[in-house]
């Protein structure tokens, strides 16, 4: 099994993110001892969000079902889409995830949505996903 773990937030790989990795990795290893885990930090890559070129929507086109924009995450998007699981760790800023993580998710997920009378997905597989977040709030809030 290959599992990708993403972390977004501050550029520095701080103690909160290190604790996230330890917590998530221990949980994965408890369930799947031989899991291959690839960690990545979104700020280690130079990329932008979707640019609305619609290359991913052109049926029978070379980019149909995948992002056609070429940059640092082009190959990574393919790898992540074939993973057997994904764990995303992120702080919450201004009631949402950081923009860099949002951009990655746009580029990863939007190509799989097909427009028609009904929306459906052409994703290569269903992927178990976990999202671990932190925010500056108490449990009561």
Go through each PLM region and give its residues.
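N-terminal beta1-alpha1-beta2 submodule of the flavodoxin-like/Rossmannoid cofactor-binding fold
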Residues: 1-117
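Short, glycine-/small-residue-rich phosphate/pyrophosphate-handling segment
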Residues: 115-141
């Amino acid at each position: 099994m290959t599992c990708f773990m993403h972390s977004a937030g501050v550029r520095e790989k701080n103690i909160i993110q290190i604790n996230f990795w330890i917590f998530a990795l221990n949980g994965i290893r408890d369930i799947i001892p031989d899991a291959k885990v690839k960690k990545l930090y979104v700020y280690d890559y130079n990329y932008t969000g979707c640019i609305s070129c619609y290359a991913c929507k052109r049926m029978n086109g070379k980019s149909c079902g995948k992002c056609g924009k070429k940059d640092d995450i082009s190959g990574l998007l393919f790898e992540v889409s074939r993973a057997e699981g994904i764990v995303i760790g992120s702080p919450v800023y201004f009631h949402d995830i950081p923009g860099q993580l949002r951009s990655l998710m746009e580029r990863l997920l939007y190509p799989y949505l097909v427009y028609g009378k009904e929306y459906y997905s052409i994703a290569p597989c269903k992927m178990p996903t976990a999202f671990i977040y932190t925010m500056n709030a108490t449990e009561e809030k």
